[in-house]
Each structure stands twice: as structure tokens, then as C-alpha cells.
Amino acid sequence: SSAAAQTTMDDDAAPEGDFNSSSSEAAPSDGAYLGIEDVRVGSHDGYDRIVFELTGEGTPGYFVRYEDVPTQQGSGKPISVDGTAKLVIDLRGMGYPFDFQMEDFPSDSVKPTSTSVIKEVVGAGTFEGQTQYVVGLKGDKTPFKVFSLNNPNRLVIDFQSK
């Protein structure tokens, strides 16, 4: 695992680095204790983007990978999400919603209409310091990249679109 790339830019800025279909992993910063304020999905020229806006202290870690049948942490129950390929995102270094005066982190299904490859994003809860989301994609396993942004603190996943 490597340190997460840290960049300051707005949600629309084009990212650096290469797209890849293999799993991507990074450890959270020491003492990271984060909550999720917002989940946004957008379409850009050449890529679709998911932004997790965070609150709390530190930089998030993550484990992002494709799974044929995504299952919930802890329970092992299958997670239902629209799409052919399914990408599982575990955000690491997370607290629980009540620690941030929230009833829950954003978990409602997001079904964007303007995206090329993202069909649905579903929140699957927090368990032992990890908050899980599953992304359903149109078509095959789409190359992606994961990185962190500052001011505000965000974790970003970009999906290459045709």
C-alpha cells in the first residue's frame, strides 16, 4: 500500500495519473477519524467522477476493487446495485455517524442520469472503522483511479469513459 496522493483542487479539475482496473489500496493517515458529509457523482470529458466529501481529522485510507457479488461487511449479505460490473469502495479511518452529530452517512442510492459509465452508487454502512459503498457500472470493469483532495477533505474515484 502506498500513501494516498494529496492534491488541492476543485471537484471539476482534471486528475493526474493513469487509469487501471486492478485493486487500489492505501492506509489512512495516523489518527484519521472521519465521517462522510456528502457523496456526489458527475460526468466530465473522458471520465465520470464520484466524490466523497469528508469531515473530521486526517486523510482517508481505502480499498477499492471489483467484486462479482459484493457483500456487506460484518453480515456477508449481498449488496444489490444496478450495473454489470460492481466496484466496492471501503473508506478506511472512519468513525460512526453519531460521532459527527449525524443520523447516518449518505447511503441513499444515487442513480445519475448524465454519466457515461456509472449506473448507481449505494452506501452499505460502517463496520469497524470502514465505510462501504458499491458502484454499479454500465458494461465491463472500467479502468479507474483513486486519490485524495484537500480543502475540503475528499476521496475521489474517477472512471474512464469512452
Locate the predicted segments by residue.
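Short linear recognition/processing motifs and adjacent strand/loop elements at protein termini
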Residues: 2-162
